[in-house]
Amino acid sequence: MFEKKTKIICTIADNRCDEGFIRQLYENGMNVVRINSAHASLEGAQMVVDNVRKVSDRFAILIDTKGPEVRLTQMADAVGFVAHTDEIIEIIDNPAEACRKGRLYTTYPHMAEDVPVGSDILIDDGSVDLSVIGKEEGKLICKVMNEGVIKGHKSVNVPNVHINLPAVTEKDKKFIHWAIKANIDFIAHSFVRSANDLQEIQEILDAENSHLKIISKIENQQGVDNLDDILTYCYGVMVARGDLGVEIPAERIPLVQRDIVKACRARKKPVIIATQMLQSMIENPRPTRAEVTDVANAIFQSADAIMLSGESAYGEYPVEAVKTMTKIAQQTEQTLDVNLDLDLRKVVKPVAVVLARSLVAATQELPVKALVFDTYTGRVGRYISTFRPEVPVYAMCYNDYTMRELSLVFGIKAYPFHKVRDKEEFAAESIKILCNEGKIQKGDLVGFIGGVFGAQVGATYMELKYI
């Protein structure tokens, strides 16, 4: 069976995180576990982490922060109310109050100050559109543009309007400090608007000397506009199509997704496509044809990872959803072409990326069975992956956290590895590991890429040899 290269992220909730369940997901193709802090307590998140590590210490854990989001307060009437077209609804600046019919309150106390007349306020991912037709002190006067049910704690989006919220909330900070102690691998920060939004998180990580990597969730037009700067300060990007599809017109989502993936590829950064990939499988055992095509198109576009949210967190068919993604990936990847395009202006280590490109090019002309590299940082793996080699790629990782970070990179299978004296020992020891697993055998031509064994950091040589 063709081993898939696209990585799969599964959202797991603490009310369904037993060891057996996680093992099933892992054995069917899951590479990364996602915990959504918006719906988790610290105790619940720790339970997920503990059970994940019982299954394996080789795959990564990612935690989402809430970021600068606005929500409705709780509803005075638990069932909410129906907003009818052309009704007038007031949005009042008082986060301590409960919403009721005709009056809404949000978690942000300065809506009236920040939101101008003429704006659209979208409730619950756009289910209800409120047009701002007037404002008074501490109050917005809105007209209901379409009928819908409004319930408490639902999302509030104001497209093309800057809301002056802090980039990192107090709850985010608690989860970040917990993530450092719990040895989490990735922090996916929500609603990243600019590189400045990442700096506060990085300062916390640096103060703790943490290896955690930041994933920027692009969820609004500001994030799209500032993507190039954002990519400088993060490990990778998540295309979070849920809020993004509310903040910008839905018909632009495919184009924005394509452009974000292209930008990440140029910068050699992992990119995740998320939200509603197999949405119907929350309730049905089989996906729609459109969903299958959506997953395949993400892979065609060169996404490193694809993500399940509700499908695995609370859906009726979580294991089937992972199996489905795996099958789509296996089928699609067999048609991918090697892509040797390279722009050296956008890479940190030009020598390493040129070596990686040359080694992948060699697989087009010679019967190379596998590519192998050793790494402290995983950077060479990201470089090799960008060119989409057809042959398997194996990483020998000197740090366990680097091994887990590569769980997010297309086509890389990572192994823990011990320090060696020189490149001959590196080749011999890695061959032994891969032969024992049946990945390669005597007589195979294998490509190696690595660095000098000393102070210089980064790949400095490539080698092809028969084993």
Across the structure, where does each feature detected by a protein language model lie?
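Non-catalytic helical/linker scaffolds that mediate oligomerization, partner binding
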Residues: M1-I467
